């Protein structure tokens, strides 16, 4: 399928299906729409009136057009209130159009939607991402896939002019999102710690990245007792992956760290019935997004040096598993009383944060499916953002808005660290039930000295049980697009 920008407008374009977007209560047939309605033999007005189309968010219609017109089908999508129009709304509109076109077996599609911030290039990129993400099909594990081959061969973005650069950029970003989606969607017998190394190796070889993989012995030499404590029970060897994109003259040096638990049984504090243990293949969502971001950024080639870090292992049960009550020593010398083996992700991140800071980076972002408490607080669509550095937090919020992904900044309430204090170690790995996502962030903060750092809890948005905007049911690839936009923003 080819996506391209064009100077043709809805008034001049010819093809199988024309898609139009309307804001809520702005569906009057006036001006250019009058000419378009005449061109379509009155179908536009008739469709809006008969179906009571008001342009509300999520509203969509499709209709055949008279055989004498240059358009065979007409697709209408509602964009909601104009005051709430943003990148997410635009991308979701493109996704809705793409799915309708697929269902109608359209071959050539013309898309006419409002521009984002009067910027044709930005608009073309958002539309491209929305279309490609909506049409992505992951049928790897089906013997007889229900989704049939997509008939769509050409999508033209109307009125935006030639936008090959913006479209190409979006396609590269989407390739990273799809890598993350497919890693998270795959079961734990398909994506193991060793699979992480294989994927990182392929990225390094394909895009000229530097790769360092530390095994058990190397991690022991660095004193990574927190990471290795989690890894003890698994028969699969731990893999500490350090992938580097290094341009010739970087203006910034950053680290992105993803929690990479390829399966989380809970350890000896095993996840019981009704806990969703069968979904714990996605506990490596942060690591999948980290490698997805690496794939996109390596193709986009910004002048920013980035270190991608994944401490990959499983949290399993065996005779060698860490016990509740064990004391682990992290690589910065701090001791941790393990009062819950099911709070293991923060232990792996602790050593990864220490490792990243020693690289001399200027900012660190970690992302993790860390706490159910964050889902309770923010639901399934919004990720939590914690940072003691407001400048970094603001950069990430701007990037998320541009990417069409949602984050909400949460408090770093230092008083809550009282709940993590241990009588026999420097800290416990979990605190009281209340404020659990905040105490998790405060725990991670103990492994950062001075470097600007942000923590993203992505436990909710990494997966969706049903179609949601640009995402189909399953893994979303969140927040690859935010990470990429953050890096690109610093490269400007």
UniProtKB/Swiss-Prot annotation:
EC number in record: 3.4.11.1, 3.4.11.10
Record: residues binding Mn(2+) 2: 259, 264, 283, 344
Subcellular location: Cytoplasm
InterPro entries with a match to the protein in the record: Leucine_aapep/pepB, Macro_dom-like, Peptidase_M17_C, Peptidase_M17_leu_NH2_pept, Peptidase_M17_N
GO cellular component: cytoplasm
Domain of life: Bacteria
Binding site for Mn(2+) 1: 264, 342, 344
Keyword annotations from UniProtKB, A to Z: Aminopeptidase, Cytoplasm, Hydrolase, Manganese, Metal-binding, Protease
Cofactors: Mn(2+)
Gene3D superfamilies hit by this protein: Leucine Aminopeptidase, subunit E, domain 1, Zn peptidases
Cofactor note (record): Binds 2 manganese ions per subunit.
Function: Presumably involved in the processing and regular turnover of intracellular proteins. Catalyzes the removal of unsubstituted N-terminal amino acids from various peptides.
Family: Belongs to the peptidase M17 family.
Record protein name field: Probable cytosol aminopeptidase
Organism the protein comes from: Synechocystis sp. (strain ATCC 27184 / PCC 6803 / Kazusa)
Recorded name of the encoding gene: pepA
């Amino acid at each position: 399928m080819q996506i391209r920008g064009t100077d043709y407008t809805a008034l001049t374009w010819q093809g199988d299906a024309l898609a139009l977007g309307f804001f809520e209560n702005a569906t009057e047939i006036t001006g250019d729409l009058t000419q378009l309605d005449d061109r379509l033999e009155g179908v536009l007005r008739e469709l809006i009136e008969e179906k009571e189309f008001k342009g509300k968010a999520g509203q969509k219609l499709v209709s055949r057009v008279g055989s004498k017109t240059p358009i065979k089908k007409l697709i209408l999508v509602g964009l909601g209130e104009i005051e709430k129009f943003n990148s997410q709304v635009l991308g979701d509109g493109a996704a809705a159009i793409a799915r309708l076109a697929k269902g109608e077996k359209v071959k050539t599609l013309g898309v006419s939607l409002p521009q984002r911030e009067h910027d044709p290039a930005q608009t073309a990129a958002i539309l491209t991402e929305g279309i490609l993400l909506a049409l992505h099909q992951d049928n790897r594990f089906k013997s007889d896939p229900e989704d049939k081959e997509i008939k769509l061969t050409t999508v033209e973005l109307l009125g935006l002019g030639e936008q090959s650069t913006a479209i190409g950029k979006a396609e590269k970003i989407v390739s990273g999102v799809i890598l993350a989606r497919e890693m998270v969607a795959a079961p734990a017998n398909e994506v193991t710690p060793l699979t992480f190394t294989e994927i990182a190796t392929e990225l390094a070889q394909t895009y000229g990245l530097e790769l360092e993989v530390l095994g058990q012995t190397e991690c022991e030499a660095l004193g990574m007792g927190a990471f290795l404590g989690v890894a003890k029970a698994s028969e699969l060897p731990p893999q500490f992956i350090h992938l580097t994109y290094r341009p010739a003259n970087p203006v910034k040096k950053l680290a992105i760290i993803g929690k990479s638990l390829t399966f989380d049984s809970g350890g000896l504090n095993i996840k019981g019935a009704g806990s969703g243990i069968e979904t714990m293949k996605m506990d490596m969502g942060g690591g999948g997004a980290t490698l997805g971001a690496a794939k996109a950024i390596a193709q986009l080639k910004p002048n920013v040096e980035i270190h991608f870090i994944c401490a990959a292992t499983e949290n399993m049960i065996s005779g060698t598993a860490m016990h509740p009550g064990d004391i682990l020593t992290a690589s910065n010398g701090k001791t941790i009383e393990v009062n819950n083996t099911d709070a293991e992700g923060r232990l792996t991140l602790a050593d990864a944060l220490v490792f990243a800071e020693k690289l001399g980076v200027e900012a660190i972002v970690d992302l993790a499916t860390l706490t159910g408490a964050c889902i309770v607080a923010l639901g399934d669509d919004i990720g939590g953002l914690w940072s003691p550095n407001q400048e970094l937090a603001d950069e990430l919020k701007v990037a998320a808005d541009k990417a069409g992904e949602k984050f909400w900044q949460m408090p770093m309430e230092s008083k809550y660290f009282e709940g993590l204090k241990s009588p026999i170690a420097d800290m416990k790995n979990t605190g009281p039930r209340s404020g659990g996502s905040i105490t998790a962030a405060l725990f991670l903060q103990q492994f950062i000295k001075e470097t600007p750092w942000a923590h993203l809890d992505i436990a909710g948005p990494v997966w969706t049980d049903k179609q949601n905007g640009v995402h189909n049911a399953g893994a979303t690839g969140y927040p690859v697009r935010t990470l990429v936009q953050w890096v690109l923003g610093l490269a400007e």
